[in-house]
Amino acid sequence: MAQSFGLIGLAVMGENLALNVERNGFPISVYNRSRDKTDAFISTRAKDKNVVATYSLEELVQSLERPRKILIMVKAGAPVDAVMNQLKPLLEEGDMIIDGGNSLFTDTDRRVAEMESTGLRFIGMGVSGGEEGALNGPSLMPGGTEAAYREIEPIVTKIAAQVDDGPCVTYIGPSGAGHYVKMVHNGIEYGDMQLIAEAYDLLKNVIGCSDRELHEIFSEWNTTDELNSFLIEITADIFSRIDPDTNQPLVELILDAAGQKGTGRWTIASALELGVATPTMTAAVTARIMSSYKAERVAASKILEGPSIKFDGDKKAFINMVRDALYCSKICSYAQGMALLGAASKEYNYNLNLGEMARIWKGGCIIRAGFLDKIKVAYQHDPNLANLLLAPEFKQTILDRQSAWREVIATAAKTGIPVPAFSASLDYFDSYRRASLPQNLTQAQRDYFGAHTYMRTDKEGIFHSEWTQLAKESLQISTPEVPLAHVEENEAPREVVETAPVETKS
């Protein structure tokens, strides 16, 4: 009997997805380039299950019912293309390849176009949830043609995480939409993790919380509607773990140098390309880079002294303020992520449903959190919401707690504790809420040295000033008795020298 589904790549994620597919009633064939890996899987975790081992791509293809559906779980980039190039000659019209890795969305755009032009189908599917999610139900983000998605819908809706309002999967959009949404998910994840790390740093190094106290604090936070999440849950768990070799808290023995695989950088690069501000994600990526300078930081710590101010306030009150600062910063981080998804949807014609994106992240994935339901509701009430900060509930939350947020960041500055993501989030809020920013000066500078022109607030049009000439004239009329900024009551304002420029951008 032919199998319903095929899978290539038996690392842990591949194995767990294969078991998930089989457990949900879909017979599956598996292939791995290492025969030993395949044999080990079949003889242990897949023993006595409806999982068929194959030892060549030809055998895999022949074992599947048509139209064939084959999930690739290999490293992103060239390995995906290599597997696809070997598979394509073996497939027939209507057969489908699904890439479940963290591929760059532009690669997925290319692969969808190439496959569809030959009568084959291609789905780029983001998979979030790690090893546990892959086995028990991940959040899935499939993109490609809707017709291709409908063919795998019966399978993916079964294997995805299940929450109160349905499976954590939906048709994301055309081309690379699925991998784009997964990329932004990962960017938000970077922000979440950095914000939590900064909260930990403040609690430990400003008010001296022990790991036992940190476990209790994060455990309590995880019971709240605001901060209940997978990442807060595992953070609390981490603080309870003792290293058996030293009888010390394990987290304190881990080198403070965080790695990254690149999806955070991809998110930032895309945001810059689309002109979307994502300062919290950027701060998170930069913090990981700074952490990698371990040897330099150790050397610098012996040379560069920081402030000697010690915190002498109320410890419990500060813990509550850190909680408020963390939540406000988290709202800003998600606002940036959703704004980026909205901009990409318009630019690439993805037609994303932002409320639905929040819904499918409620379960299975790394950023799953209770407050995602609030984001879903916000976009259901107003699908054209310009920014999450403007949603009534989130707006009021920040207005009510911004005093604590600012106090925490001020305390961090006074005590020499870096909080780049907290600070970037507050800067984002303050910049977004201000009707006027100092970039009028920036634009004047650009026009001064590069004739980049400017617009005015008092009349229509695009203008350029001869700034050197204006400076000379201003010097001629100034006197020692009259400051440059002072204008006599009866003095007529001087006319700005302007020319009609060519409209240019830079």
Predicted regions and their residues:
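NAD(P)+-binding Rossmann beta1-loop-alpha1 motif at the extreme N-terminus of oxidoreductases
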Residues: 1-68, 91-94, 131-134, 487-489, ...
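Glycine/threonine-rich flexible loop motifs
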Residues: 69-86, 101
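Rossmann-fold dinucleotide-binding core
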Residues: 5, 80-83, 98, 104-216, ...
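Interdomain hinge/lid region at the active-site interface
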Residues: 179, 204, 209, 224-331, ...
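C-terminal amphipathic alpha-helical interaction region
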Residues: 399, 404-486
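Small-residue-rich helix-loop
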Residues: 221, 225, 346-379
